[in-house]
From Swiss-Prot:
One of its GO terms (cellular component) is nucleus. It is found in: Nucleus. Its EC number is 1.14.11.27. Its main location: nucleus. Residues 390-400, 647-665, 674-712, 776-806, 813-835, 892-902, 1031-1040 have a biased composition (Basic and acidic residues). It comes from Caenorhabditis briggsae. It is an enzyme of class 1 (oxidoreductase). Its cofactor is Fe(2+). Histone demethylase that specifically demethylates 'Lys-36' of histone H3, thereby playing a central role in histone code. Pfam families: Cupin_8. This is JmjC domain-containing histone demethylation protein 1. Keywords: Chromatin regulator, Dioxygenase, Iron, Metal-binding, Nucleus, Oxidoreductase, Transcription, Transcription regulation. Residues 86-266 form the JmjC domain. Residues 1005-1016 have a biased composition (Pro residues).
Amino acid sequence: MEPEELTIEWYEENGLEKPIHFRCDPTRIGMKLPSPSTFTVDSVLELVGGNRMIEVVQVEDQGSVKMTLEEFVEFYKTPRDQRKNLYNVLSLEYSLTPLEDLVNSPALVRQIDWVGNIWPDALRQRWISFNGREKKSYFPHHTFPKVQNYCLMSVANCYTDFHIDFSGTSVWYHVLKGRKVFWLIPPTATNFFIYQEFIKTVSDNAFFGRSVEACHVAVLEPGDTMLIPSGWIHAVYTPDDSLVFGGNFLHSLSCQTQLRVYQVENKLNITRKFRLPYNEELLFYVMADYVKKWTGREYVRPLLVEDAKLDYVGEKWKAAGGHLKKIRFEDYNVEVTSEMVKNEEESEKDEVKVIAMHAGSSNYDNAMISKMSYTEATGLEEEAEDEDVKPETKKEAEERRDAEIDLLAATNSLIFYRNSKHDFIRNKSVPDHKLPIGHEPPVYFNDEEVSRISPRLLEELEALGAYIRRKNRVEVAEGICHPASLINLFNTVLKKRRAELTGKPFQFNQIMPRRYTRAAIETGDYDFEPVRTIEDSRRASQFKVEDFPDELLESDEPDETSRIHLPHQPSSGPLEYIPTPRGEIRENSLGFEPEYDEDMEEYDPAEQVVKEELEEEEEEEEGEEEEEEEYVAPVTRRSSTRGSASTKEEPQEEKEEKEAAPKKEKKEKKVKKEKSSKPEKDTTEAKLKKEKKKKEMERRLRDSELEAELRAAHGGKNAKSKKKPEKPAYVGGLPTAPIQNDPVVSNPYNYDPRMEMMKLGTGQLKSAYRKTKANVELHIEKNLYKLEPKRDESESREPSMEHEDSPTTPHAPYDRYSHYHTENSHFQEDQDSHRTPAKRSKYDNISVDTSESPHIPKKRSLEGRPSPYSVISPPHNRPKLSSPAMFSPSSEPRRSNDRRTSDPAVNAMKKGVYMPPMSRQDKMIAEAASASSSRHSSFSERRPSFIPDLNSSRHSSTDTPMYTPTAPARSSWLPNTSNVTRHSLDDDSPIDVVSESPIDVLNSPPFPRSITPPPVSLSELKSQSNGRKSNYSEDGKRAKIPAREAVAELKTLIGKLKTLNEA
């Protein structure tokens, strides 16, 4: 492009998206530069000052070294072959020095630069730190983004690796001497991601240009100028010794890229030293500047030079020639405290530092001097001071300026700033930009300025507004007191412009003005008068008082009867609560306003107290009469204050009317006595009366109905007040159901809410949110029960009783299948098998039928063992047992009330506690698995009826006659269960179902039934093993089998049990 085309119009239309290389006279693009033939590094040393400390890049490791400018110039002048190290100066900012008058950036850059055009001039301040014992060298620190002008001095073979300029700033670059080679990479999303990974790998020495999508090369010769857009990744190589001028700037048409780079810096945790200072404060100033153009509102307080806390170096200072003066330690005699610069960068630990600023008597610090006097070196004439002017103290000047700002903000609705006391803390992030906005005056848009927002600019500014709104904490700039209102209005204008470009209607939600109370309007405690709306004008009367004659107007005298005056409320919006004074509220003892007729005389609180006492006496007398009534209903508040209707017949009503007549006479007499005994009211007596009334009210509040209910709930009694009898309440002519004290449904968990309450002042109620052992676990007896027949008394005794009998009467262990039962005992055992099981320990092993006698292995005779399908003999033909140990009167089960009452399960059932039983399948698996471990228990115990006794063959004797178990006769109401095909020959399940009688079903508790399995012989198990090796030896002992076979056998048993349960 031609140099003359680089204008503001071209910029607004195209923006800065690609690098622009100009090889022309720099004056054609609005630049100002010294002559290359006469300007050298010695000129820089003379104009800037040799005692200025600079940070130099060490090319070998891309580190940094500090040295004075004079030391670097000496290194620069050394011959090329004598340089041991390569140093590169990239951070010599020459603003506020005489060199600034010789070099100017391109005209377009100066027009669009945010820092040069928007940053407040009064906030351009600095402070200087002097180093060394002699205080010759110094380092300047600035309180604004000072990045506009740089002088870059590089020796040959210097290289700067790939980087993005801080905060996404754009760069202008002019080569005065030497050459520069640039590698440029566009800021695409892919390249940004690769660059972040490149920054993280510090030890990577590979050339980054080969890892990206595209990389461009540009060679700048002496006299060339280039503009590098925001976000472009670039590296620079210096083939010859060079002297370059450049600078960084931020502008509006690169907001998205600038914010993206700023976020990448936050993500990579780049130190403050290598970032743009005061970036977020600058964003607030930019938004405030746009809002002022679009709406006329001013959000930035005009800052004064006199308010500068540090050394002012703004435009007025430069116009006075302050930048021409050399910096020397002798000119600074005021030290700056560490609190003033605690957030600034600190120098090295080993250097000697003295922080100083201009003296108080300096030419740039006195606010009362309109024209400053200068030395002879400046060439300006001195002006005599006015003798009549009296100096004003600093405190008086601050108070005067604050009063002026407050007056301006109160009178002008476009002023949205306050005095300096409302400023935010400097360099501290706050979330105040997300506070609610509140009331605001109407917004007036400048349509001419709003229409200048191009689609390109609108997209960039929308990204800026969205970023500030989403950020949790921001650094609010000095002078801005309403950041939330500023952000809201900035985004509102952008929405309006977006609606205009898209052709959609714009709906602006104007924030309603605050509804002021009458007190605020009378005292003037408001910012501006509320605008009168149409609704208010509708409510206003169309006629005036002067239009009516006096005869038609009401008298101004106040009415005798007190009226309730409602406050004036708007027709829309929330109603305001105007509290009524405490003295105007009349309450009775219960805290409610008493009801009285409109035609009654003036309200007297003493008379009301007497009436209440009389009503209480009446109610007590009525309660004594009504104690004989049968029906008593709970008391309601309405029924207690008003007289309840009597439910008696007409003769009783007539009696009540007769009794009521003398009561009225008593009331009138008491009231007359009280009135006659009243003395004349004096001031002291009135005060005493008020105090007495307050004490009486407090006493009655303490003894109120609420406190009585609380005491009753806590178990206490109200000793002061007499309990009144409960009266029936009627709703719609029918009596309500009385409230039951006891719960209708039984409490299954034994939870008593009254036990959770405690008296006030004695402790703290249990928290519903704090999980503790007390409020999580229920107090229930955690006992596991097994369903098994009831044991007799001999079996429930201690094991020592059995040990005494075992040596005298050696016998085989108890075999349930060989036991002889009479008809009654069989029925009785069947009944007991359905009773509540006895309490069993949680970890008790399942015992088997063993005894302490020595085990004599014998073969069981299988001749007398019936098959499952053999004919069952009747019960009266059963043979008697020959062994006395197998059957004894003490071992016969019998029904006893003591056992039923002492059974913990029965007690638990009476209490209403549900004890969940184990499933039948789980019990069978558990007992089958633990049968081998409990074979040699210390005492004999009956096996549960649903577990087959597979090992009983090794204890049975051949001499013991076998019995044939019988099933009860099938009743007519039961299905046919005696079918011989119920268990086929292939089914090896040892479990059968014993049918029940109707009486057993009706009387049995809701517990699982015990099932008596049919007898199973060892031969049957061997025949049903499908050719598999038997697990039992000839002597009846269980042989050891592999674990896999045991698991497989257990699985088959479980499967068969499941099929039986499903059937």
